Amino acid sequence: MPTPSMEDYIEIIYNLIESKGYARVSAIAEALDVHPSSVTKMVQKLDKDQYLDYEKYRGFVLTSKGKKIGERLVFRHELLEEFLEIIGVNDENIYDDVEGIEHHLSWNSIDRIGDLVNYFKDDDSRVKDLKKVIKESDQQVNETAEK
């Protein structure tokens, strides 16, 4: 199983390859706000652990194992963003919140969150009811804060 740091790299590499057809060390370093030498070290580790095939000066590609993990990590990230949106988290907080929690949830928890997201998506009235509850809760918090 990859470490949280390895997951971050695999997710970025997967997204870059999906969007551009390739992933360069410089783009990965920029996306993760790390030094290119750190990316090179991690790429070598991911190669050793068979998540990607790396040839010095020639680049790298994800292995089938790396692609499978990458797909699952992107799914997890998107699912958590959707979940936080449904439960009314402010848009400006969603990305950072997902980054803060995604590595700390088991896949069982992710699957249950997926079930919950599907439950809400299956019937728009459920989302409306939840938004009503959130609005009432926010009003109570504001009233309490004003006292």
From Swiss-Prot:
Keywords: Activator, Cytoplasm, DNA-binding, Manganese, Metal-binding, Repressor, Transcription, Transcription regulation. Belongs to the DtxR/MntR family. DNA binding is strongly activated by Mn(2+). Coiled coil: none annotated. Central regulator of manganese homeostasis. One of its GO terms (biological process) is intracellular manganese ion homeostasis. Mn(2+) 1 binds at residues 8, 99, 102-103. HAMAP family: HTH_MntR (MF_00732). This is HTH-type transcriptional regulator MntR. It comes from the Bacteria. It is found in: Cytoplasm. Pfam families: Fe_dep_repr_C, Fe_dep_repress. Homodimer.
